[in-house]
């Protein structure tokens, strides 16, 4: 078993929109890797129930993508609320990661952290205050080494678990082609 203090928590949320004050979490997934980005475990993938009124209020982009992916139907059928999703996710993470040790890992992860702070504060507090944001490397590569960008493409399914897998693969790509680590 790897050292729980060095394992990394990868998280992705799907939301009804981009405003943590008005929108809500509709899906959460996590993956734990070791420090070398080897997957140790995949956590629960949870559709979080929200009201029909909230789902009907989504903008066109979210309505189209979340309906096409089947997520809206899963959210409507779900009996999991924010608190249950939070506790199930923490119970999974505690098996692999020491609380307060892992940065929050993912793509544009600040947005996920904002939603967690509002709706799943215990889970947000489980992370270290630092972020490991793959989108930072993408922005730096775009400016400093744009020739490597075509070498990695994403499917952008906008399903939490698939998005995490792509984020990990993207970081592996940047480690090899940009950071040279």
UniProtKB/Swiss-Prot annotation:
Keywords: Cytoplasm, Exonuclease, Hydrolase, Nuclease. It comes from Alcanivorax borkumensis (strain ATCC 700651 / DSM 11573 / NCIMB 13689 / SK2). It is found in: Cytoplasm. Its main location: cytoplasm. GO terms for biological process: DNA metabolic process. It is an enzyme of class 3 (hydrolase). The lineage of its organism: Bacteria, Pseudomonadati, Pseudomonadota, Gammaproteobacteria, Oceanospirillales. The keyword Repeat does not apply. Residues 8-171 form the Exonuclease domain. CDD domains: Orn. This is Oligoribonuclease. The keyword Secreted does not apply. The gene is orn. InterPro entries: Exonuclease_RNaseT/DNA_pol3, Oligoribonuclease, RNaseH-like_sf, RNaseH_sf. The active site is at 129. Belongs to the oligoribonuclease family. SUPFAM superfamilies: Ribonuclease H-like. NCBIfam families: PRK05359.1. Its EC number is 3.1.15.-.
């Amino acid at each position: 078993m790897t050292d729980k203090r060095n394992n990394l928590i990868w998280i992705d949320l799907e939301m009804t929109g981009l405003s943590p004050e008005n929108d809500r979490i509709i899906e959460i997934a996590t993956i734990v890797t070791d420090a070398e980005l080897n997957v140790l475990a995949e956590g629960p993938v949870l559709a979080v129930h929200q009201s029909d009124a909230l789902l009907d209020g989504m903008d066109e982009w979210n309505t189209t993508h979340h309906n096409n992916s089947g997520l809206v139907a899963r959210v409507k059928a779900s009996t999991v609320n924010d608190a249950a999703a939070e506790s199930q996710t923490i119970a999974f993470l505690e098996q692999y990661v020491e609380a307060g040790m892992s940065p929050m890992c993912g793509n544009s992860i600040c947005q996920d952290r904002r939603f967690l702070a509002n709706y799943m504060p215990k889970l947000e507090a489980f992370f270290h205050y630092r972020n490991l944001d793959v989108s930072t490397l993408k922005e730096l590569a775009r400016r400093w080494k744009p020739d490597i960008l075509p070498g990695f493409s994403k499917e952008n399914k906008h399903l939490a678990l698939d998005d995490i897998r792509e984020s990990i693969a993207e970081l592996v790509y940047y480690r090899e082609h940009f950071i040279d680590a």
